[in-house]
Amino acid sequence: MPMILGYWNVRGLTNPIRLLLEYTDSSYEEKKYTMGDAPDSDRSQWLNEKFKLGLDFPNLPYLIDGSHKITQSNAILRYIARKHNLCGETEEERIRVDIVENQAMDTRMQLIMLCYNPDFEKQKPEFLKTIPEKMKMYSEFLGKRPWFAGDKVTLCGFLAYDVLDQYQMFEPKCLDPFPNLKDFLARFEGLKKISAYMKTSRFLRRPIFSKMAQWSNK
């Protein structure tokens, strides 16, 4: 029986999950919920099911795999990654995976908070000034490695790819000073399963955010 991944009909928090499911050739189906237009932003599609799915902490995204029902995006990622030994093989690799996992969430949340802020246009110039330092830290952490944890693909690569790609969409030149990050994105997109998935109609690059956001909302 295929796994069921539930989320809004946007890229949001689930792009790394979708990419990991594709990379691992996992059998899954998507349950996509649609949010209504502003100002009401009707969420009844999700709210009508929210407490009927047997989730301990009902939220989106969720993953249902037989008797296993999981919420929280990173918990879902780790569940899939453990099945395929993608959490790092050595202690050093596992430490690097943990660091990037949490750093990527911080970096992602900073962009989310800006894009859902009513003062988006006013705050955007200051936010743009902070991007080079953010990207510099990722570049230095990656160094000359092909992947963030080392020589092999791990779950943190899916998170790093997604957040770096979002920032590049937000500020197209932000990775120009960091060729190793641009090479990393190209290397990731060149993975056979990933490349094939990105050519399908199922791949959702945008919108990144819901209709309530000030950027990438359609």
Curated annotation (Swiss-Prot):
Binding residues annotated for substrate, in chain numbering:
Y116
Any one GO biological process = glutathione metabolic process
Location (main, coarse) = cytoplasm
Q: Which Gene Ontology CC terms are recorded? A: cytoplasm
Any idea which positions bind glutathione?
Y7, W8, W46, L47, N48, E49, K50, N59, L60, Q72, S73
Residue ranges of the GST C-terminal domain? 90-208
Q: Which GO terms describe its molecular function?
A: glutathione transferase activity
Q: What catalytic activity does the UniProt entry give for this protein? A: RX + glutathione = an S-substituted glutathione + a halide anion + H(+)
Protein localization = Cytoplasm
Keywords assigned by UniProt, alphabetized: Cytoplasm, Transferase
The domain of life for this entry's organism is Eukaryota
Q: Which family does it belong to?
A: Belongs to the GST superfamily. Mu family.
What this protein is reported to do is described as: Conjugation of reduced glutathione to a wide number of exogenous and endogenous hydrophobic electrophiles.
Protein name per UniProt:
Glutathione S-transferase Y1
